[in-house]
Amino acid sequence: MLIAKNVTGEWVWITSRTPVQQCPTCGRHWVRRHSCNERRSAFYYHAVQGSGSDLWQHVHFSCPAQHPHIRQLYITYDIETYTVFEKKGKRMHPFMLCFMLSGDPQLVSRAERLARQDDRLKALDEGFYWLDSHPGEVARRFRNFRSRLQIEFAQNLVDRYAAANRDYCDQLVKDGKYGSVHKIPYELFEKPTSPLSLPDNFYSVDIVVLGHNICKFDELLLATELVERRDLFPEACKCDRSFMPRVGRLLFNDIIFRMPNPNYVKKDASRVERWSRGIVSHQDARSVFVRFMVRDTLQLTSGAKLSKAAAAYALDLCKGHCPYEAINEFISTGRFHADADGFPVERYWEDPSVIAEQKNLWQKEHPGQQYDIVQACLEYCMQDVRVTQKLAHTLHDSYDAYFQRELGMEGHFNIFVRPTIPSNTHAFWKQLTFSNYVREQRATCPPSVPEPPKKKGRTKKKKQPSPDYVAEVYAPHRPMFKYIRQALRGGRCYPNVLGPYLKPVYVFDICGMYASALTHPMPHGMPLDPKFTAQHVEELNRLLTNESHLSYFDARIKPSILKIEAYPPPPEMLDPLPPICSRRGGRLVWTNEALYDEVVTVIDILTLHNRGWRVQVLHDEMNIVFPEWKTLCADYVTKNILAKEKADREKNEVIRSISKMLSNALYGAFATNMDTTRIIFEQDLSEADKKNIYEGTEIVKHVTLLNDDSFNGTEVTLENAPNPFSEESLRQQFRYADDPEQEEPEAEEDGEEEGDDSDRESARKPKNALTEDDPLVAVDLEVEATLATGPYIPEGELSSAHYARANETRFKPMRLLEATPEALTVLHLESLDKQVANKRYATQIACFVLGWSRAFFSEWCDILYGPDRGVHILRREEPRSLYGDTDSLFVTETGYHRMKSRGAHRIKTESTRLTFDPENPGLYWACDCDIKCKACGSDTYSSETIFLAPKLYGLKNSICVNEQCRTVGPGKIRSKGHRQSELIYDTLLRCWRRHEDVQFGAQSNIPELHTRRTIFKTTLLNKVSRYDPFTIHNEQLTRVLRPWKDLTLYEHGDYLYPYDNEHPNPRTTGDVRPVPIVGHEDPLAPLRWEPYAFLSEEECGQVHDLLFADDSSQEAESLGV
């Protein structure tokens, strides 16, 4: 008998002991019987064992509302450029920069004072400008202005911080002998020796540099903005930089000066409640800061031109017009072609119809004044700045109002904290999901009501939601990120006919396909552990075997992403619209072939099964099963749809544009791809980065050295440098051992080399020499005599000698930049394991969005091709659809009639529901005829259509189907990669006729057709570009117009059909599918093709003997291949 204390601290007698066992799956201790719980096992696998945490990370959350007491300063600018012919091509240089200041009045006043310190700065109306055609001069002056802003506001942050902690800072300055509080190291504020404090109204500063299309144009031309001099900034604040060039644009180039916030509370009991209402308090911020951000309004308006953005957001200002080529010629050559009034001629204007308007505008604003193209360009540039500034303020106020009114939050929102629409809509979604989750948890068990105890003992307290995570949404991490992205398959885009189609063609598209798909159920909860995942795979295989049709909303089926094998039905049951695509062969191909080792969602599994495919789910260690379905995005998308409909009724163009963009961009946010490459400046290398490079876990893939004329520096000419061999220069470098006139150097502190001159060399003759004359004097005299005679060069006409003297040499000037090498060196770091650390994006949601969209298309396929099944796919009359493009189908006349009869319930009406209804589960989507008659609003068709390639087609016209109308409207040309203004329907038709002539070996009278356009060749940090980093050059791009060559379908008769088992994809016919050995550990390994992995003749004989030998007499043998 033992005695021990129980959980309440009381002494108790232990009368008996029973051995217990611990479950390896869920960790629970048991004596007799035990059954694991899914949730407990998942938690034990992820949180306790830590195995799952290497594959999944809880999506991190931080309230996107704006921090209190933040003041904003906006610097809105625009530049005008001209081209210069250089050795590498036509390079663009800025010659004019206009900017305006807005925001907090005190900050604007201080910034204006700093701007006026430049004596070359001029004012125009409410703005300022620089005008200088020397390369790099305008950029240098703008850089100096921004540097003065950074230094001024960083020092002001330190001064205000020190004023709130005067005693502590004065003591540090005194003890450390620092010249000022700016010199105090940041670490002494991060880990203070005495408590610090800040007033509740202590403010931070956001300085936003704004422009339209500056991330792909202006900021690249102003390359000097990339260089920082850290020695000019106060040491008391920490300087961090976010630098991310991506996809031809500078996505991030932000700098933040921060100091620790002593009021920060790490675990605040009220944080969950406040953040659920969209309120951020001063104790939520880890730092107080001055933040410099570069934001492009083009990225915040979904790539709309400034003129269209101004109209979309109902601005009372409009963008002007400018003859760019005339300005370029004038700046480059000093003249341009003008008419009798001195106005640029018609060829300079993009739209000649505006010439009269621009003339009247000039005469109205400048009566009696001769046309000045530079002044007109200046006013145009300043007008662009004015429109951009108005657009920026409209965006800021409108998104703030949207955050409060439509999402129901109580705080404020600053759209410029994040650079793009996808990043902002992702933040909105996380905020709304977090708020809904907190509300659900509070409704289930309020904080004041403890959960009733299940057993005798302590009352179990309900765990409250964490403010650091978004509901129960997890992001694939490291190896799982790569695996999940295999289920991310793109949209449908291919024609089923090449060339002209001379019958009616109707265009239908799904209304808001991604928005509708987002409202359907998505995976939610912590992924199951391998044991329960395997059990669900077995259950799913049983359902696929025993039942011919399965509902997408069957309660027995859990959301999952699995590896499968799928075998198609007979050719009589196949359709020209396959249910899924494959990347085998290196191309994304929509195919009816058998699928092997494909990673798909359970939605795709059910779609394949219901279309007659035989699907088998494979057991794989990377298979993922989630515990439950939940409409995670439905609330957010529904709010956007309702806001758009409300804006339509109220004629509010601003809210309409915002709600439409946010819905369309949410899917793209979930599908964000990441890699293991980072691009940073050498001066931003952290100690962790240096350690990883030293240990070899990270490597430097590429080094880019920045150099540009706009960088600040000093010109040095060698011809003005002193002669290094003169007596004066030599005296500075050498000291005679016995020179009494030579000043003795100051004694070193360590006392080395005192009084010992015996070992020092002397250039003079020693006093105790045996000879009076220097032994080298004779040699010197001989050398001087030889030099005086000069070289032997024959005289006459045959002589070609050059007699230039050394002192006549012209040295090339050298420029010494005012920056450290670390500030000019950009490193490309790459992780060797190639695994992405992800805790932001729930990529599986994007996979399910595409899965639901494929389910929509599968139902659409049933509408069009259901009656044709049972007839071989090649023996049917004609396809009901001719072209598919992501969310649209081009259908024939028979396909249109089937849409009106069999698919009438899927054609959108005023009462059609486009969002998922949990009370009545089903697929919710609708489509409509894309091109409507402008006269009566009825459907239209094209009497003749030509298809040349994916995203290259033409509709000749649009004829109304209404017999009483029959209006003939314009057609439609789609020409990806070509300048659309140069193409008409007849041009596409001529291209096809030439293709037919060449195909049949004839000599075509039609010349090869092509389109030309001038492009801006942007070079950021490209390793293989012939251009310098951060430059923009003009190039003429010529593209040949020709039909599709690399087909992803097979041709039969007049139509194209998807590959099937009878007509396999030629790109994959040579692939060998190896069967993995037992215990293989790399499920992500690509398919290997080993052409020499076959049996030899001797091995074939051994196999034959084993197969036909008598079992009683044959001994066991092993054969290794």
Curated annotation (Swiss-Prot):
Catalytic activity: DNA(n) + a 2'-deoxyribonucleoside 5'-triphosphate = DNA(n+1) + diphosphate
Alphabetical GO biological process terms: DNA-templated DNA replication; viral DNA genome replication
Superkingdom classification of source: Viruses
Acidic residues biased stretches: 739-759
Subunit structure of this chain's protein: Heterodimer with the terminal protein; this heterodimer binds to bp 9 to 18 of the genome. Forms a complex with viral pTP, DBP and hosts NFIA and POU2F1/OCT1 for initiation of replication.
Gene: POL
Keywords, alphabetical: DNA replication, DNA-binding, DNA-directed DNA polymerase, Host nucleus, Nucleotidyltransferase, Transferase, Viral DNA replication
SUPFAM superfamilies in the cross-refs: DNA/RNA polymerases (SSF56672), Ribonuclease H-like (SSF53098)
Cross-referenced PROSITE patterns: DNA_POLYMERASE_B, PA2_ASP
GO molecular function ontology, one term from the record: 3'-5' exonuclease activity
Disordered: annotated segments: 443-467, 736-775
InterPro entries, per the entry: DNA-dir_DNA_pol_B, DNA-dir_DNA_pol_B_adenovir, DNA-dir_DNA_pol_B_CS, DNA-dir_DNA_pol_B_mt/vir, DNA/RNA_pol_sf, DNA_pol_palm_dom_sf, RNaseH-like_sf
Misc note: This DNA polymerase requires a protein as a primer.
Enzyme class: transferase
Function, as annotated: Eukaryotic-type DNA polymerase involved in viral genomic replication. DNA synthesis is protein primed, and acts in a strand displacement replication. Assembles in complex with viral pTP, DBP, host NFIA and host POU2F1/OCT1 on viral origin of replication. The polymerase covalently transfers dCMP onto pTP, thereby initiating complementary strand synthesis.
Protein name: DNA polymerase
